[in-house]
Amino acid sequence: MRELKDFLEAIGATYEPNGERLNVNVRRFVADPEVAAQIRDRGRLVYAGRLLGRTRGEFIPGAGLLHELARMEGPNKVWVDERVGWLFACGRDVFAESILRSEGELTEGTCFLVMLGGDCLGYGRLESQGEKTILKNIFDIGDFLRRERGLEENR
């Protein structure tokens, strides 16, 4: 689960999942040790315990993990208003001037959780594009809906 550790390090979080970590295909889970032992005995798995996220080159956190990280002290966070939050959830990037406040140093290459009030909408990486500084959207809560819409259009 090196990818999970890399993700947590990138956003400045010191998070240790309670339970045993399980890899099922590209998905990463955590389950109680007793449950994990029973799961392993069953053979072929599809889902096991609580989803942390999936790995496709890099770790993509699940909504549950983002929710947990949002409640913690320590991870880098930026807060946006409702309009910017909606655009971010639709896959758009955040301009630096749209950030209302932040926890963590706003330096290029740093990853931040994007917050709307107490809710985490996803995360991004601070980048420069010419004269502008943006928070590049890496993952947002609208990802699932966009993937589902793509499946519907392909039917």
Give residue ranges: language-model regions.
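Polybasic, low-complexity RNA-engagement segments
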Residues: M1-R155
